[in-house]
Amino acid sequence: MSEKENAYSFETLQIHAGQENPDPATDARAVPIYLTSSFVFKDAATAAGRFGLTEPGNIYSRLTNPTVSIFEERIAALEGGVGALGVATGSAAITIAVQNIATAGDHIVSSTNLYGGTLNLFEHTLSEQGLSTTFVNPADLDAVEAAIQDNTKLLYAETLGNPNSDVLDIEGWAAIAHKHNLPLVVDDTFSTPYLLRPIEHGADVVVASATKFIGGHGTAMGGVIIDAGKFDWAGNADKFPGVAKPNPSYHGVVFTEAAGEAAYITKARATLLRDQGATLSPFNAFILLQGLETLSLRVERHVENALKVVDFLNSHPQVERVNHPSLSTGRAKELYNEYYPNGAASIFTFEIKGTAETACKFTESLELFSLLANVADVKSLVIHPASTTHSQLTDKELEAAGISPTTIRLSIGTENIKDILADLEQGFDAVK
């Protein structure tokens, strides 16, 4: 990112970062879609230099692609990182972010308030590969620190926990991580960099499902990893040899020497993306770039509508409880006001009076809301987490995540608020 780009405001960066000037090959103002598998080297020395990480440039679209690179540069600028890696899905982003520094025999400390797929990844898939996880209540900082072991490689949490949008004390988690010379990895999907930039509060690595608010229209899958460039990998070389010592999978390169402050994200691209192939397609990157151009406008409307829905539900006689950070008390409310002064959390849950059958019937009765397993679309969405997104969790895990049989998750869209409220009301009428 140029110095000039760095001086721009968020709303300008979301449109221009990564492509300050027209396409140099065609003079196209819009970002071109480079649908090519590979790139021609002008000579053998250029080819060798690119493979040896001594000369920048494209090799193969599994690793880099001009369209994807613009998306990565734009996201890095918006999050305030030194570099980013676009991948096929949010799940791929989480997996690569963790496996980049943690392997068999290592340990993770993770928040319990996570997307069900992430919980399953940590509890089962990574566990089967020899990587263990201790889950802790994210609000209990003493428990977070107590869970750290000699083989712990990272702390992991979501800035707004899925599905209740519980607010993370990022600075508290970061202080604990850095006290023990560990990086803090956070999922910023529900917040977006427009509402919160975790790197400014101490996060070392940020991941997100770009499928959600970044794309914003439910049309393209994607994930992204952002490197803050601040963690001292070289100073902790024994703990993170893959980043800070000769890497045998890349002919002995030391990524902290070859890439400097971007060592972490360079290793992720050069090894894990190379080997696992969870590549973001240029077409999807183009769609996600289209979404980024209106991110701030959409998020403002999402939040505005959501807060009105929260007020509506909080006074509704058929609602047992609304789980939204604006209604929290004590330290939780302090964190919400501190990190989200303009509001947040258009994805949240409420508990309907009745049974699980009541909750499911309510989701089926809505007409404007779509019953589907996605969030952060311009369209309003609804789902019953206990039987869908979090159905693979045990009863104990559901309780720890704040999910009951009557919990309903809403993702509030950008439609007219009168229409949103009217649809919710007719849903309640259907289950009276």
Model-identified regions with their sequence ranges:
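Conserved small-domain helix->loop->beta segment predominantly found in fold-type I
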Residues: 276-279, 283-285, 290-294, 299-301, ...
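N-terminal "arm"/small-domain region of PLP-dependent enzymes with the aminotransferase-like
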Residues: 2-65, 73-74
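PLP-dependent enzyme catalytic core of the Aspartate aminotransferase-like
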Residues: 2, 11, 123, 132, ...
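Glycine-rich beta-alpha junction loops
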Residues: 19, 35-41, 212, 229-230, ...
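Conserved N-terminal alpha-helix of the aminotransferase class I/II PLP-enzyme fold
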Residues: 43-92, 117-125
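Conserved PLP-enzyme active-site core in the AAT-like
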Residues: 2-5, 18-22, 84-315
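Well-ordered beta-strand positions enriched in small/hydrophobic/aromatic, beta-favoring residues
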Residues: 155, 223-225, 322, 348, ...
